[in-house]
Amino acid sequence: MKLMKTQDAVGQVLCHDITQIIKGVTKDAVFRKGHVITEEDIPVLLSVGKDNVYIWEKGEKKLHENEAAEILREMCQGEYMHPTPVKEGKIELVADIDGLLKVNSDKIKKVNSMGEMMIASRHGNFAVKKGDKLAGTRIIPLVIEKEKMESAKAVCEGQTILSLKPFVHKKVGIVTTGNEVYYHRIEDTFTPVIKEKLADYDTEVIGQVVCNDDHEKITKAILSLIEKGADLVLCTGGMSVDPDDKTPLAIKNTGAKIVSYGAPVLPGAMFLLSYYNEDIPIVGLPGCVMYAKRTIFDLALPRIMADDKITAEELAELGEGGLCLNLSLIHI
């Protein structure tokens, strides 16, 4: 790459896009990388502030920004996503399906710490829709050493930085607990909220059982729904430490493995996550899910719907950022 006065660059090959910005009208390239500069181009280049331009010199051990962006794109792109055409040195990745975005945080941090290159992505472990932008890649200068890009590629170790897990169909069973609902003292306002959240995914509710505060009956209800084919059971009510609240004990008595009873998220501290036979989630939902805009359930549900198992360590990491404040920035 060589810097040359624009008036002297006729016949030379541009090594980067030349962008024209007119506020409220356009922001686009007037000349693309690889364009051979003509006499007629000189006034246009000068009008966009280019008194000097970078032109290609052969024999360099360097990569142009577009070529480097392709390498970064290849490092990031997993299944079910596609790239946009390279433009002004940048490539973006777009989702081909609805699913759960996974990001290798360690690898993206290592690449971004190398300097002269960047990968910007959405938060991992969030639901995305088909057509959503997932990430963008580019280098900072116009050219970069080939050797440096090879070092960046080595960070990936044959695995892409991004992956997109498709949501799967779930047959859902709902167990509603509490004497107040069972004996018709109050209306069940929890189940409509649950069904509304499930409507964002490929789900069918195959049954609902209403139980009083009898832990043996709750356990029996959970197991009966699993026998009917439920591959996700949601239990509402009875999740606090009050003496009449028996849902955590009932879930434990199914034989399910308890991942965690309690999560460092507000609202949602009394959340319970367990897996029956290692693969069927049984979830105890605290009352806040019924009225709060964002809770722990909104963070866990996308992962459950993609069969992405959640660990106790991942739940513990929610403490930083776990104060929801009705925002959607916290993530697992």
Q: How does the language model describe each region?
A:
Residues 179, 206-328:
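Short glycine/threonine-rich loop/turn motifs
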Residues 59-167:
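Extended, charged alpha/beta regions that create polyanion-binding interfaces
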Residues 1-88:
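Short, low-complexity N-terminal leaders and the immediately following helix N-cap/first helix
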Residues 159-213:
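Glycine-rich phosphate/diphosphate-binding loop of Rossmann-like nucleotide-binding domains
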Residues 32, 38, 123, 127-130, ...:
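Residue-level recognition of short, solvent-exposed, well-ordered loop/turn junctions
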Residues 331-332:
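Conserved small/polar residues in nucleotide/adenosyl-binding loops
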Residues 55-56, 81-86, 144-146, 204-208, ...:
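Flexible, glycine/charged-enriched surface loops at secondary-structure junctions
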Residues 7-11, 29, 83-86, 126-128, ...:
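Solvent-exposed alpha-helices and their adjacent loops that cap or buttress functional pockets
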